[in-house]
Amino acid sequence: MKPSHSSCEAAPLLPNMAETHYAPLSSAFPFVTSYQTGSSRLPEVSRSTERALREGKLLELVYGIKETVATLSQIPVSIFVTGDSGNGMSSFINALRVIGHDEDASAPTGVVRTTKTRTEYSSSHFPNVVLWDLPGLGATAQTVEDYVEEMKFSTCDLFIIIASEQFSSNHVKLSKIIQSMGKRFYIVWTKLDRDLSTSVLSEVRLLQNIQENIRENLQKEKVKYPPVFLVSSLDPLLYDFPKLRDTLHKDLSNIRCCEPLKTLYGTYEKIVGDKVAVWKQRIANESLKNSLGVRDDDNMGECLKVYRLIFGVDDESVQQVAQSMGTVVMEYKDNMKSQNFYTLRREDWKLRLMTCAIVNAFFRLLRFLPCVCCCLRRLRHKRMLFLVAQDTKNILEKILRDSIFPPQI
């Protein structure tokens, strides 16, 4: 007899799934909104994954999450490139886009300040991203605060502060303002090729000096040290440019997906909690043999298999999930206590105490007192139920993480 699954309503929660030093794109980014994503499919897909979780069908849930991430990946993201005039912002944008300065679509560059209004650019290397080339600071008497207001910093998702030759007070002010807005930002030191060609210091020492100078200036104003990249816009394959690209791709995924998937995880957590509550009630009030479809409700190993099946974390399902996510099954099983009863008992001291030799002997002696035996049996089952539910949450969190950043095999 196969155990039945209960349907429960779920409300979104916001667990601590992905801590960062910076606030997410939105602290209240509801998963099922379509105005952000431009897709009316998301509410439907969200409901289908919730239904799959209630029914213990994790593979169906994985398919839904993948569709969700694919849709979220199309959300437009705005990146502001800013800094002092003459720091090479336009040249950097061209290098980031892997485009020559003389091409028609390139950002104008030159000795004279060419960028007088903010200009947007796109790149096939960063789909659905708008790179904004902002006018440089310092060319007018305009304050940094007025500049921030005029350039509409509040509309930006991620900032790249360009510096060269020196890390000025304007750079520090920009960093402090952006940090106060809770936005992600990088500092990119350009023209490194020129620094290396004119410096008497070794390359290693010069790079250390630049980074230490940036850190010291930020610390004076209590600004948290952001990602810093030392590059040459003349060669986007050297120095920190590859690292910058990789970091940017990851942060774009975080900006688009982190908050919606945190909300979705909260919904999943609620569904798992509701299922636990339903089964606790059944354990307390119903025959365990009938509820679980087992012959011996004291056979903890067999009962554990049933609980894993109820939540969809049985061996076959976990194997299918791992294959679908493009990784080995041990990536998921390594974090599971409930792989088998021996492992579960070893990992959980409460269950180990409930099933130790002394308790088992006591259990056998009190066979003639059904109420006492029944109470102990139910305690064991509730503990197993709780542990399987915890494993389910861990697997769900890993699925969501891996859907944003696929594991490297």
From Swiss-Prot:
Effect of residue 398 to A: Does not affect ubiquitination by the DCX(WDR77) complex
Induction: Up-regulated by LPS and IFNG (at protein level). Up-regulated upon infection by various pathogens including T.cruzi, T.gondii, L.monocytogenes, M.tuberculosis and murine cytomegalovirus.
Its EC number(s): 3.6.5.-
Top EC group: hydrolase
Source superkingdom: Eukaryota
Cross-referenced PROSITE patterns: G_IRG
Knockout-associated phenotype: Mice do not show obvious abnormalities, but are more susceptible to infection by S.typhimurium, T.cruzi, T.gondii, L.monocytogenes, C.rodentium and M.tuberculosis. Upon infection, alterations of blood elements occur including lymphopenia, anemia, and thrombocytopenia. Mice become anemic and neutropenic as a result of chronic infection, and their hematopoietic stem cells are defective in the ability to reconstitute the blood of a Bone marrow-depleted host. Mice display impaired expansion of activated CD4(+) T-cell population: defects are caused by Infg-mediated cell death of CD4(+) T-cells.
Keyword Cell membrane in record: yes
GO-annotated molecular function: cardiolipin binding; GTP binding; GTPase activity; phosphatidylinositol-3,4,5-trisphosphate binding; phosphatidylinositol-3,4-bisphosphate binding
Effect of residue 359 to A: No effect on subcellular location
InterPro entries: G_IRG_dom (IPR030385), Immunity-related_GTPase-like (IPR007743), IRG (IPR051515), P-loop_NTPase (IPR027417)
Effect of residue 358 to A: No effect on subcellular location
Domain IRG-type G residue range list: 75-251
Residue numbers carrying Phosphoserine: 202
Cellular component annotations (GO), alphabetically ordered: autolysosome; autophagosome; autophagosome membrane; cell projection; endoplasmic reticulum; Golgi membrane; late endosome; late endosome membrane
Domain notes for this protein: The alpha-K amphipathic helix mediates targeting to the phagosome membrane via binding to phosphatidylinositol-3,4-bisphosphate (PtdIns(3,4)P2) and phosphatidylinositol-3,4,5-trisphosphate (PtdIns(3,4,5)P3).
Descriptive protein name: Immunity-related GTPase family M protein 1
